[in-house]
Amino acid sequence: MLSTLHNAWKVPDLRKKILWTIFLVAIFRMGSYIPVPGIDTGALKNLTQSGGLISFYDLISGGSFSRFSLFALSVTPYINATIIMQLLQIAIPKLEQLSKEGDDGRKKIQKITRYAAIGISIIMAYGSYIVIAKYGALKYNSPIDIFLIVLSLVVGSTFLIWLGDQITVKGVGNGTSIIIYANIISALPMTGYQIYSLLIAGKINIVEVILFVGAAIALLAGVIYLYLAERRIQVQYSNKAVGSRMARGQSHIPLSIIGTAVIAIIFAMSVMSFPMTVANFFPNASWAQWITGSSYSPFNSGTWMYIALYCILTIFFTWFYTQITFKPDEMAENMHKSSGFIPGVRPGKPTEIYLEKVLNKVALIGGIFAAIIAIVPVLVANYTSFQDVQFGGTSVLILVSVSLEIMRQLSTQLTMKHYQGFLN
């Protein structure tokens, strides 16, 4: 990794891209400390440490939500809009057809996604206002103050969408991923400080710290191993004349084990948090009190039923998203059109059935590991002394995936530069 960065720094074009990325990330990190006016951030501390979806959003926003800064929503509206658009492409034939029209179709879908992200940011901004008002974090509550809060959050989120595009075009990696990556990295020193504070206060001992760090390293190693792991389906192509002899082409279809884990966890987290969010709007209702406080409620993070349901939903969404991402029927059809076949499997419907069976197995393995990643913060909060420490397997997964993707992109561009130098 370090050698790749060192070699990339020697190439002027890549060095310029790296510097552009650092510059744009610095702008957005400075903006994450610009507060929205009229907010008492001290009252939000318990909210962001309560676990669940809000804690996760605070983590991927680099603590911007707990500070309720201009970038409190981060790129969350854009992520949600992207996921919704991917699902709508399955349900709406016109959108599905648009996605198959090459660059022009993708640009149109991207434009729709951005408009949808702005709409979602308005809804999330107003929802954030309701939440902070419930926790008594508003210094003023006039209509103009509400308008300024919503407007500030929407403008901040829209600016980050634009900034992410600039990083993608002028910098290194995917802009949205880089923003989330930088936010999680920025939260690591605070995590270390929280552990140190617990140790000094006598709430934990050095043995617990060593075990915690060891578990984090083991989780990191497991995520790296499974992220790089893939199930390869061998594909052969019909004989073609190459000079005076016949040659048979070979290739493979790589299926990532945990490629859809992040989205699956976000889906499951959203479903699990939705009843609790609705219940918070009706604190005096008996059904709301049962959802938030009953030991038999599957939406109460302190119960074993919550953990079980969370795992089931994560495995299901991993399978679901794997199916809609790879589409066995289209894979089989494209393979047949290119005169390709899987050894020992007949073309057409048998190939589709075979691909679906392999995808189901891969999705099950990936879903189980995704479920383990998802419940790590819940287990830490319920059964350890590290309740106040923001630590999640999902953040580790994001860090690993973005780091490896950046290295792959730099390696590819370095290879292209070497070839260009050779040709010139």
Feature locations, PLM:
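N-terminal cationic and glycine-rich segments that engage phosphates or anionic surfaces
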Residues: 1-99, 104-424
